From Swiss-Prot:
Full protein name: Ribosomal RNA small subunit methyltransferase H
Organism: Alcanivorax borkumensis (strain ATCC 700651 / DSM 11573 / NCIMB 13689 / SK2)
Binding-site residues, S-adenosyl-L-methionine: G38, G39, H40, D58, F84, D104, Q111
One GO term (biological process): rRNA base methylation
UniProt keywords, alphabetically: Cytoplasm, Methyltransferase, rRNA processing, S-adenosyl-L-methionine, Transferase
Length: 312
């Protein structure tokens, strides 16, 4: 691991903002739906009272192991293995509604920094990208058989890659000659199609994001957990979500808007579609990482934090 990797590996994003705006009850029940290496959870436990409770959820085996170690040393904490949309099971286990749900979306720094996990286009490793390497198929496996149009659709839908068809065509041409099994192999292929036209941004960024989202079903899980939050949060409970790209943030933004009585209206103030009853109230403004945090944690530069409180 490089010096830069060590610096960023265990820095939870927007920690103070999350604790100040999201945490409200020292004896409450909280869920960290994306435990990772436990940065947010450990900070929350430092504020949680003796009778408070925190459940961490993650599907990454290394994160689960870290969570189990924490659980062994703190009886207020319990670790659950699974996607964050297993929220109902967490509530059932605790026997009470949630006072706060935190989701820190996307890939974690330890996952990105470990070449063997296959998330990074800067490090050579197996083209995997699964959050749980024991479940489902890897990106390499999917690319070995997926139809050209399906590859293009994934790159466009989840990566907003304008030249998705060009990349998909090159992938299908290349795999006829040799399998695409390594991260740098795919990154170089994409760069050969796009060139390096965006200053400060690797040409494979959008495609790697798209493939990761697809192979892990990330946006489907986000849709599900947002709906689950309406039924599992206590009145006054708060939902805090940190997103790192526009697709995630758009889903969160529209969900909070639609459930807070702020859906857009047409002429005469009439709703454009079915108007949902208000169940959420936004808390504060949309937040981004401070200048001070950006200096010590460059990976927080694209982070967006939205918080909403359940009111009904």
């Amino acid at each position: 691991m490089t010096t830069e990797d060590t610096q960023y590996a265990h820095q939870p994003v927007m920690l103070e903002e999350v604790l100040d705006m999201w945490f409200s009850q020292s004896e409450g029940f909280y869920v960290d739906g994306t435990f990772g290496r436990g940065g947010h959870s450990r900070a929350l436990l430092s504020r949680l009272g003796e009778n408070g409770r925190l459940i961490g959820i993650d599907r990454d085996p290394q994160a689960i192991a870290a969570g189990q170690q924490l659980a062994a040393s703190d009886s207020r904490f319990h670790m659950m293995a699974g996607r964050f949309d297993c929220l109902p099971q967490a509530v059932e286990q605790a026997g009470r509604p949630i006072d706060g749900l935190l989701l820190d979306l996307g890939v974690s720094s330890p996952q990105l920094d470990d070449a063997a996990r296959g998330f990074s286009f800067l490090r050579d490793g197996p083209l995997d990208m699964r959050m749980d390497p024991t479940q489902g198929e890897s990106v390499a496996e999917w690319l070995s058989y997926a139809a050209e149009k399906d590859i293009a659709n994934v790159l466009y839908r989840y990566g907003e890659e304008r030249k998705s068809r060009w990349i998909a065509k090159r992938i299908c041409e290349t795999r006829k000659e040799q399998p695409i099994t390594r991260t740098l192999q795919l990154a170089d292929l994409i760069e050969s199609v796009l060139g390096r036209n965006e200053q400060g941004k690797h040409p494979a960024t959008r495609s790697f994001q798209a493939l990761r989202i697809h192979i892990n079903g990330e946006l489907d899980a986000l849709d599900q957990v947002l709906e689950q939050s309406l039924e599992t949060l206590a009145i006054g409970g708060r939902l805090a979500i940190i997103s790192f790209h526009s697709l995630e943030d758009r889903i969160v933004k529209l969900f909070i808007r639609d459930h807070s009585g702020r859906a857009p209206k047409g002429r005469g103030g009439l709703p454009l579609g079915d108007e949902l009853p208000q169940r959420l109230e936004p808390v504060g403004k949309v937040m981004r990482a401070s200048k001070a945090e950006l200096k010590v944690n460059v990976r927080s530069r694209s982070a967006v934090l939205r918080i909403a409180e359940k009111v009904a």
